[in-house]
């Protein structure tokens, strides 16, 4: 049976013992995809970044190494956020980024409505949310749209090649990179994770 990725109880139990884990790809690999877009933002303004479902990833530390301190890490499990603070403090000696308890499918309840971001990222959080069905994923997308600044966009890494094939999605979607999955045998077929760039549509 698949894990109950959409249930908070699953993550509470998991994060009780898990201190660090990277979904689908290392933060370094994901950051290599994000970096050109981040550089484009930073040429015009300091970047305000929202990471959805930060879990026990160290992705936020990569943003800080790039000089980005206006980073808000969101997870609905407080234990995950404590792990994030620990990872930041271990790397830099202090904690300067934000860690906010919020449900990514109800962002308007967890973040002030006027809180806007130039860049929203998630590393397979969309896959966990999708376990609860299309309605939950659309709620997540609507919340992201509401919290994007003008010209802002969302970069999402997913195991699915059709993750955002949804009606009423408030975004135009483009696959900007594919990451090969590990093979058990050389003869295994090529399978890729998809990295999506989502920009608000005009509908």
Task: Please provide the spans of the model-predicted regions.
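Conserved beta-strand signature within the Rossmann-like core of class I S-adenosyl-L-methionine
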Residues: 151-158
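A short acidic, Gly/Pro-enriched loop at the edge of an enzyme's catalytic core
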Residues: 105, 109-120
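Class I SAM-dependent methyltransferase SAM/SAH-binding core
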Residues: 50, 55-107
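N-terminal, positively charged/glycine-rich alpha-helical extensions of SAM-dependent methyltransferases
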Residues: 1-20, 25-28
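A short glycine-rich, Lys/Arg-flanked "PGG" loop and its adjoining helix->strand segment in the class I
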Residues: 135-150
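A short SAM/SAH-binding and catalytic strip from SAM-dependent methyltransferases
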Residues: 118-134
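Conserved alpha-helix/loop element of class I SAM-dependent methyltransferases that forms part
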Residues: 24-45
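Class I S-adenosyl-L-methionine
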Residues: 163-203
